[in-house]
Curated annotation (Swiss-Prot):
Belongs to the class-III pyridoxal-phosphate-dependent aminotransferase family. HemL subfamily. The gene is GSA. This is Glutamate-1-semialdehyde 2,1-aminomutase, chloroplastic. InterPro entries: 4pyrrol_synth_GluAld_NH2Trfase, Aminotrans_3, Aminotrans_3_PPA_site, PyrdxlP-dep_Trfase, PyrdxlP-dep_Trfase_major, PyrdxlP-dep_Trfase_small. Its cofactor is pyridoxal 5'-phosphate. GO terms for cellular component: chloroplast. Keywords: Chlorophyll biosynthesis, Chloroplast, Isomerase, Plastid, Porphyrin biosynthesis, Pyridoxal phosphate, Transit peptide. Its EC number is 5.4.3.8.
C-alpha cells in the first residue's frame, strides 16, 4: 500500500476550515479558526537546505513528507519544550526521537558534559567511563553479561546481524514486517520508520542476495515464524525484533508472542535478539525484556544510553559476545566508539533514571496523555486506538486493534496529517508521521499534558 501522501491529499488535509453555520435547514456548530502559525524563517532555511542536503534534511522523516507542509526548523530546546527559528514554542513529544528522556538540556547531564569537555571529547583509546557505563547496563539488563559500545543504533543492529551469523555459522536472519533496525542493507526489506513514511517497499541499492537472506514474518503471529523456520530448516541464524514496535507506530506484543519466539529460537538453535534501541531504559529500568519477563540472547541499545549524544550498544551472553574482536574472530570497530562524551551523558542519564519515582512519573504522565487524546477524539466521533507503556505511546486513526504492521495500514494517514498540522498550530510538536511512536520525559508535567489534551480537543473539533 502506498503510504506517501500525494499532493491532492495533502492539499485537502490543510484546506482552510471555514466556521460552520446554518446549511440549509441544519444548524452546525461554529468552530473557532486555528491560531496562525508563522514559519517564515523555517521556510527560508529549509529552502536553502534543499540545495545543500538531499531532500533538505539529514534523516528522511524530518522532511514532513507524510504530513505535508515544510518542516519546522528548531533553534533551541529545554525541558519538555522546543522553540523554532520563528520564535514559536511547542510542547515536545518527539524528544529527539527518544534520547531526551530526562528532558532536553537536563542541567545535571549538561554539567557533566561541560566538565568532560575540558578533559577531552574523544580519546581513541580506552577510558574508565566505558567501564562505568558498561557496569550500569550489565547490572540492569537481564540478557547482558558483556557489552560493546558503538556510535548509533544502526551500527549496533548491523553488528549483531554479523554476530548472529558468526556464532551460528548460518546466513539467514528473520525479522518482522514494519520493524525498523536501522538502514543496513539487510534491514531495509519491508522495514518501518521513514521507509514506511516515504511509501517505499524496500530500498534501491540492496543486493538481491542480501534480500534473499532476510526473511520477514508477521508481528504477533507465531505461525508465520514457525512456517519460515520449517521452510528454512537449519539455515536461520537468528530472529531480531522490536519488543515493542515504535517504527510502525506504537504496537504492543502479546506475552505469548515473545515467549513463543524464545521457545522457537531455543529449539531451533537460533539467536534471539531484542532491538531495544527505542525501548531500552525507556519502558522499564531493565528495558522491555524486564517488563515482559522474556530474556533474549542479544540486545541492541541506543538513544537513552547516550543522553542525547550519538551512541549505540549491543550486548548479551558472554559465550556469544566473546566472538567479537579482539576477543574473537568477528570483526567490528569504530573511531568514536565509547567516546567520553557519550559515556558521560549515558552515565548521568541512567543515574537519574535509577532514582525512585522516575518510571512511575513517566507512566503517570504518559497514560494521562494518551487517555486524554483518545477521549477527545471520541468526543468528536473520530475513530482512534492507542496506548502506552511507561514513557512511550502512540495512536492510530482507525477502529483497531492494531497488532501488526498490516493492521497499521488501515490508519487514516490523511486525518493524521490534519491533526498533526492542527497540533502544531496549537503549540504541540508530535512526530511528523502516523508510523512513529511518541515519547514523554521526566520534564513533562501534568500541566503540559492537560494543555496538550485541551489542544487536541480543539483540533478534533475542526478537522
Amino acid at each position: 500500500m502506498q503510504m506517501q501522501l500525494n499532493a491532492k491529499t495533502v492539499q485537502g488535509a490543510f484546506k482552510a476550515q471555514r466556521p460552520r453555520s446554518v446549511r440549509g435547514n441544519v444548524a452546525v456548530r461554529a468552530v473557532a479558526a486555528p491560531p496562525k502559525l508563522v514559519t517564515k524563517r523555517s521556510e527560508e532555511i529549509f529552502k536553502e537546505a534543499q540545495e545543500l542536503l538531499p531532500g533538505g534534511v539529514n534523516s528522511p522523516v524530518r522532511a514532513f513528507r507524510s504530513v505535508g507542509g515544510g518542516p519546522i526548523v528548531f533553534d533551541r530546546v529545554k525541558g519538555a519544550y522546543c522553540w523554532d527559528v520563528d520564535g514559536n514554542k511547542y510542547i515536545d513529544y518527539v524528544g529527539s526521537w527518544g534520547p531526551a528522556i530526562c528532558g532536553h538540556g537536563n542541567d545535571e547531564v549538561n554539567n557533566a558534559l561541560k566538565a568532560q569537555i575540558d578533559k577531552g571529547t574523544s580519546f581513541g583509546a580506552p577510558c574508565e567511563l566505558e567501564n562505568v557505563l558498561a557496569k550500569m547496563v550489565i547490572d540492569r539488563v537481564p540478557s547482558v553479561e558483556m557489552v560493546r559500545f558503538v556510535s548509533s543504533g544502526t551500527e549496533a543492529c548491523l553488528s549483531v546481524l554479523r554476530l548472529m551469523r558468526a556464532y551460528t555459522g548460518r546466513e539467514k536472519v528473520l525479522k518482522f514486517t514494519g520493524c525498523y533496525h536501522g538502514h543496513a542493507d539487510s534491514f531495509l526489506v519491508k522495514a518501518g520508520s521513514g521507509v514506511i513514511t516515504l511509501g517505499l517497499p524496500d530500498s534501491p541499492g540492496v543486493p538481491k542476495s542480501t534480500a534473499a537472506a532476510t526473511l520477514t514474518a508477521t508481528y504477533n503471529n507465531l505461525d508465520s515464524v514457525r512456517e519460515l523456520f520449517a521452510a528454512n530448516k537449519g539455515e536461520i541464524a537468528g530472529v531480531i525484533l522490536e519488543p515493542v514496535v515504535g517504527n510502525s507506530g506504537f504496537i504492543v506484543p502479546t506475552k505469548e508472542f515473545l515467549q513463543g519466539l524464545r521457545e522457537i529460537c531455543t529449539a531451533e538453535g537460533a539467536v534471539l535478539c531484542f532491538d531495544e534501541v527505542m525501548t531500552g531504559f525507556r519502558i522499564a529500568k531493565g528495558c522491555a525484556q524486564e517488563h515482559f519477563g522474556i530474556t533474549p540472547d542479544l540486545t541492541t541499545m541506543g538513544k537513552v544510553i547516550g543522553g542525547g549524544m550519538p551512541v549505540g550498544a549491543y550486548g548479551g551472553k558472554k559465550e556469544i559476545m566473546k566472538m567479537v574482536a579482539p576477543a574473537g574472530p568477528m570483526y567490528q570497530a569504530g573511531t568514536l566508539s565509547g567516546n567520553p562524551m557519550a559515556m558521560t551523558a549515558g552515565i548521568k542519564t541512567l543515574e537519574i533514571l535509577g532514582r525512585p519515582g522516575a518510571y512511575e512519573h513517566l507512566e503517570k504522565v504518559t497514560k494521562r496523555l494518551i487517555d486524554g487524546i483518545m477521549a477527545a477524539a471520541k468526543e468528536h466521533s473520530h475513530e482512534i486506538t492507542g496506548g502506552n507503556i511507561s514513557g512511550m505511546f502512540g495512536f492510530f486513526f482507525c477502529k483497531g486493534p492494531v497488532t501488526c504492521f498490516e493492521d497499521a495500514l488501515a490508519a487514516d494517514t490523511a486525518k493524521f496529517a490534519r491533526f498533526h498540522r492542527g497540533m502544531l498550530e496549537e503549540g504541540v510538536y508530535l512526530a511528523p508521521s502516523q508510523f512513529e511512536a511518541g515519547f514523554t520525559s521526566l520534564a513533562h508535567s501534568e500541566a503540559d499534558v492537560d494543555a496538550t489534551i485541551a489542544a487536541a480537543r480543539r483540533v478534533f473539533a475542526r478537522i
